[in-house]
From Swiss-Prot:
Any one Gene Ontology molecular-function term assigned to this protein's record: DNA-directed DNA polymerase activity
Subunit structure: Component of the DNA clamp loading complex consisting of tau(3):delta(1):delta'(1). The DNA polymerase III holoenzyme complex contains at least 10 different subunits organized into 3 functionally essential subassemblies: the Pol III core, the beta sliding clamp processivity factor and the clamp-loading complex. The Pol III core (subunits alpha, epsilon and theta) contains the polymerase and the 3'-5' exonuclease proofreading activities. The polymerase is tethered to the template via the dimeric beta sliding clamp processivity factor.
Protein name, as recorded: Probable DNA polymerase III subunit delta
Record keywords, A-Z: DNA replication, DNA-directed DNA polymerase, Nucleotidyltransferase, Transferase
Principal EC category: transferase
Family assignment from sequence similarity: Belongs to the DNA polymerase HolA subunit family.
Record has DNA repair as a keyword: no
UniProt entry tagged with the keyword Heme: no
EC numbers on record: 2.7.7.7
GO cellular component: DNA polymerase III complex
Species this protein is from: Rickettsia prowazekii (strain Madrid E)
Top-rank lineage group of the source organism: Bacteria
Function: Part of the beta sliding clamp loading complex, which hydrolyzes ATP to load the beta clamp onto primed DNA to form the DNA replication pre-initiation complex. DNA polymerase III is a complex, multichain enzyme responsible for most of the replicative synthesis in bacteria. This DNA polymerase also exhibits 3'-5' exonuclease activity. The delta subunit is the wrench that will open the beta subunit dimer.
SUPFAM superfamilies named in the record: P-loop containing nucleoside triphosphate hydrolases, post-AAA+ oligomerization domain-like
Species classification: Bacteria, Pseudomonadati, Pseudomonadota, Alphaproteobacteria, Rickettsiales
C-alpha cells in the first residue's frame, strides 16, 4: 500500500498492529527515512540491524527475518540499496509469516519497477516516498512545532523559512528547533530572529543558485551548488530550480516584448519572486535576451534527461555551460 506524508500516523498504527509486515522507503531524503526508522525502533521497542541488499541472499534473509533475539524483542532490519527488480524468492519470503520487521531502502525507484509495484499492491506491505520537503510541507512542520511551544511566527519570517529551508527533513527540523530555543523568551518569532539563527550554509537554496548562474557569477554558483549537495539535494531538484527560474525569466521577457511594463510583468509571477531577489532578477531581465533565455531552457531540459540516463558520470556545471 502507498502511504503519503499525511498518512504516516495511520501507517505506524498498522505496523504496530501487525497488519503491515514490511516497509519500502525510497527517495533522496535520508533524514526522513532515518526519522521513520528511529520512530519505529523507539515506539515499538525494537532492536535494529542493517545489511546491503547486494550482500543478501535468500537464505540469509530468511534467517534474519525468523531469528528471535536473546531478549525476545522484534528487530528492525534495514535492507539498504534495493533495486527496481523484484526477486521471485524475495516475493515468496515476504508473502509468508516471519518474526522481525524488514525495512527496504532505495534511492530513486522507477515508477514501473516491480519492487515498488509489489509493495504498493499488497495489503500487508507499505511504501513511502521520501522526497525533500516542499514549501507547503515545510510550513506545516514549522507551524506544528511552534504550536507545541505556544509561539506564533510573522508572515515575513515564515516566507523566508519556506523559501530557504530546502533539503533533508532532519536538517529542517534541527534548524527549526534551534530557532525555537533561541526565541524561548518571546511569543512571536520575527524575521530578525530567523536571520540571527538560521545557518548561512543551510540557507543555500535554488533561488540563490539560479540568480548566481544567470548573472554568470560562477564562483558563487559553484559554492552554492556544493552546499546544496551537502544537504543531500540531488541534481534533478537543482536542475528543476534552474528551470523554474528561467521559465520566470521567459514569462517576463515575453510580456515585456509584448509591451507590458517590466514591474507589472514581474509582479504577475506566481509564486512571486522573493523580495530580496527582485533587484537581481530585474537586472538579469535587462541583460538577458529572449533568444538566450530559450536556449538556456533547452540546455537545462536536456541536462535533466542526461542525468537520468547516466547519473554516475553526470557533471551539472559542464552540462549547462
Amino acid at each position: 500500500m502507498q502511504f503519503y506524508f499525511s498518512q504516516i500516523g495511520r501507517l505506524f498504527e498498522l505496523i504496530a498492529a501487525g497488519k503491515i509486515r514490511a516497509l519500502l522507503l525510497y527517495g533522496p531524503d535520508k533524514g526522513y527515512i532515518e526519522k521513520i526508522c528511529t520512530y519505529l525502533i523507539k515506539n515499538l521497542n525494537m532492536l535494529q540491524s542493517s545489511i546491503e541488499y547486494e550482500d543478501l541472499n535468500i537464505l540469509s534473509l530468511d534467517i534474519l527475518l525468523n531469528s528471535p533475539n536473546f531478549f525476545g524483542q522484534k528487530e528492525l532490519i534495514k535492507v539498504r540499496s534495493i533495486g527496481n527488480s523484484l526477486d521471485k524468492n524475495l516475493k515468496t519470503i515476504l508473502s509468508s509469516d516471519y518474526i522481525n520487521f524488514p525495512v527496504f531502502i532505495g534511492e530513486d525507484m522507477n515508477s514501473s519497477g516491480s519492487v515498488k509495484k509489489f509493495f504498493e499492491t499488497e495489503e500487508y506491505l507499505a511504501v513511502v516516498a521520501c522526497y525533500h520537503d516542499d514549501e507547503a510541507k515545510i510550513e506545516r512542520i514549522i507551524l506544528g512545532k511552534l504550536a507545541k511551544t505556544n509561539k506564533v511566527i510573522s508572515k515575513e519570517a515564515i516566507t523566508y523559512l519556506k523559501t530557504h529551508l530546502k533539503g533533508d527533513h532532519a536538517l529542517i527540523c534541527s534548524e527549526i528547533n534551534k530557532l525555537i530555543f533561541f526565541a524561548h523568551d518571546v511569543h512571536e518569532i520575527t524575521l530578525n530572529h530567523v536571520l540571527e539563527v538560521i545557518s548561512s550554509e543551510i540557507t543555500a537554496n535554488g533561488s540563490n543558485l539560479a540568480i548566481y548562474f544567470s548573472k554568470k557569477d560562477y564562483s558563487n554558483f559553484l559554492q552554492e551548488l556544493d552546499i546544496l549537495k551537502k544537504q543531500n539535494i540531488n541534481e534533478v531538484l537543482i536542475i528543476r530550480a534552474l528551470i523554474r527560474h528561467y521559465l520566470n525569466l521567459y514569462i517576463v521577457l515575453s510580456k515585456v516584448k509584448n509591451g507590458e511594463c517590466l514591474e507589472i510583468a514581474i509582479k504577475s509571477l506566481s509564486p512571486p519572486i522573493f523580495y530580496h531577489n527582485i533587484n537581481d532578477f530585474t537586472k538579469i531581465v535587462h541583460a538577458l535576451s529572449l533568444t538566450e533565455c530559450i536556449k538556456t531552457l533547452k540546455l537545462l531540459q536536456q541536462a535533466e534527461v542526461d542525468y537520468k540516463l547516466n547519473p554516475a558520470s553526470f557533471d551539472l556545471f559542464q552540462s549547462i555551460l
